[in-house]
Amino acid sequence: MDKLEEIFDLQDALNKRIGVNTDGMSEEDKAKWVLNYTRAMQQEMAELIDSVPWKWWAKYQEFDEQNAKVEVVDLFHFLVSIAQVLGMTPQDVYDAYTKKNKV
């Protein structure tokens, strides 16, 4: 099993533990969960932004690299969940990613 497959398996198990089963979702549920996860990603992105000194008007800011790494992983959790809601496998993600990089 490769690392991406393991991540997908771990995310599937986590989602099921918290009550989200992506197997056989209706179109309505898929739309709901894509929106839920996208909103969650917006929040995580805001937290990532707050990890960097972006406030040009504030004097004492530091780059919190450790927190930035945590937020990247949080974003990845939700991104993998969206892929799963859409029925994408690790291979589907890999294929789409490599195809997009050929552009």
Describe these PLM feature segments:
Residues M1-V103:
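Flexible "arm" and connector segments at domain edges
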